[in-house]
């Protein structure tokens, strides 16, 4: 709701996404400076490994923000609620994992609920829906590949991994946001 309120006053979702990422990066820099969080040991290998994860993070973040700018927050969240469905499908494809029959059955209420809510939506926007779907896809791909990396780079905790992803994501997003919204 805060994103939507902000976008009503400042209708620049790409720049808002950039400001949000920059805020997180500044916060983590403060945490590292004050030694409240250990500074991660960063190498070229980890930066190159995190680059695709950060790209998916960027896509997920900015797509959600653009979706909020195009339609009701409630409908964006209805679409985002389908993320577990995306997660099961993409985890099966990329991680070669199989799930129990109960996992698939548990997705049925999600699909039914999202479908029912979508049918009742008054402020429908195909653009907003597409951005929300792209956000789901980006979030799930980020999570799938992050999971792989957490197993590979065990010396970096989840907080620092997320911070590094956010820094790279900010590097991706800032110039694009500037070009799109100035």
Regions found by a protein language model. Name each.
Residues 1-182:
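Polytopic endomembrane small-metabolite transporters, centered on the Drug/Metabolite Transporter
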């Amino acid at each position: 709701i805060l994103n939507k309120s902000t976008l009503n006053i400042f209708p620049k979702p790409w720049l808002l996404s950039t400001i949000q990422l920059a805020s997180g990066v500044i916060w983590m820099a403060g945490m590292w400076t004050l030694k409240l969080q250990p500074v991660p040991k960063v190498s070229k290998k980890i930066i190159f490994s995190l680059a695709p994860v950060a790209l998916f993070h960027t896509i997920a973040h900015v797509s959600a923000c653009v979706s909020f700018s195009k339609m009701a927050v409630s409908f964006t969240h209805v679409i985002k609620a389908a993320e577990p469905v995306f997660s099961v499908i993409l985890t099966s494809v990329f991680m070669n994992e199989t799930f129990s029959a109960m996992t698939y059955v548990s997705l049925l209420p999600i699909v039914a609920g999202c479908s029912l809510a979508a049918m009742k939506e008054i402020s429908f926007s195909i653009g907003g829906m597409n951005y929300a779907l792209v956000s789901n896809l980006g979030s799930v791909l980020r999570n799938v590949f992050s999971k792989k990396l957490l197993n590979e780079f065990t010396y970096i905790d989840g907080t620092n991994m997320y911070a590094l992803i956010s820094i790279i994501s900010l590097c991706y997003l800032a110039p694009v946001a500037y070009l799109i919204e100035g």
